[in-house]
Amino acid sequence: MDTAIFIDWMSFAARWLHVVTGIAWIGSSFYFIALDLGLRKSPDLPEGVHGEEWQVHGGGFYHVRKYLVAPPELPEHLIWFKWEAYSAWLSGFVLLAIVYYVGADLFLVDPEVLDISTSLAIVISVGSIAFGWIAYDLICKSKFGDDNTRLMVFLYILLVAMAWGYTQVFSGRAALLHLGAFTATIMSANVFFAIIPNQKIVIADLKAGRTPHAKHGAIGKQRSVHNNYLTLPVLFLMLSNHYPLAFATEYNWIIASLVFLMGVVIRHYFNSVHAGQKHPVWPWPAAIGLFIVIMWLSTVPKFFEEENAQSQHLAPYEERFVVAANFDAVRDVVAGRCSMCHASEPVWAGIVTAPKGVKFETDKQIAQFASQIYLQAGRSHAMPPANVSFMEEGERELIVKWYQAALDRTSP
């Protein structure tokens, strides 16, 4: 099995695992937020019980009670909700490494944005993600973090700043994905470093016969609320790499900033409903209005048009594909079968921007995406979709020979 196929399957496996664990984490998070907001007081509740809720699901009835601090005695069987968050982050980081670190030349670095080495780009990636958690956590623990509204405003400003910063360093696709990873790291670290440790302190106090302090529950609640409001934007950012209209624009950082506001207003609506309040009307017009602005921004032309043509300087890994046997013939195949969609101005009906932001207008671009051309059009029939441009088997075989010839040139 060649390396490109192996890496693609590892990417698929990591993505599958990440989606499964993400569903588990988000599902439990949404459930407990709804449960917490839906708790009701009752005169016959035991001392220390904050509220209760009756639920029905799958033909069975459930009676749930919440202790504001902790029960008088610790039950023998206690279920922890933490592994979903840990496994979601770990699988996400593995996926980030496979796609954007192993494939840094292809997906992470864009010389037209910032011409840096792949090694430096990876260092910036890891460092910025770690920085996000450290900065956020320090602010939460400071006096500044005692005011929840003020803290949320700070968090939003931090996210907007990172959105802009990432778009100045990475490709548009990588920038939005990294903003999602940056935010998701804050969320999962909240579980690992704040929520679970404070719960363990409460349990230790119970075992020692001490009365747990309410502040430990308050810390966990604050971080849990933050996670609740950040979930929907993270999902958007993780999906954005499939939609060039979101990332292939100079206004991508503004789009990301507006998405965070959309997530807040949508979650506010559902939180209000779960709390038994009157259904607020304003969140949906606000969310729709924000989304209309996002759609408009995706089509706005650049404010400053670039005068210089895109650099055609070839990186070493690109040059090997350009000088490999059959490149001229492959270029003709790509031009005839792929360029009607993969272009700055696609001519195929219904295509307004190059799929996934991938363009095949220059030798450099073809060489840059050689592995994707090989996998999608050479080794499989994924591209062109439904073979709408009638790519022939001989042309697919030509792509395979060209790709393998390029690899053979660098083999020891």
Language model features with spans:
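Alpha-helical transmembrane segments
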Residues: F131-D137, V191-A194, L261-N271, I294-V300
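Cytosolic juxtamembrane amphipathic/interface segments immediately preceding
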Residues: T3-I7, H63-F81, H213-G217
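Membrane-interface amphipathic/juxtamembrane segments adjacent to transmembrane helices
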Residues: S29-P72
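Long, contiguous internal "core" modules enriched in hydrophobic/ aromatic residues
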Residues: Y101-H216
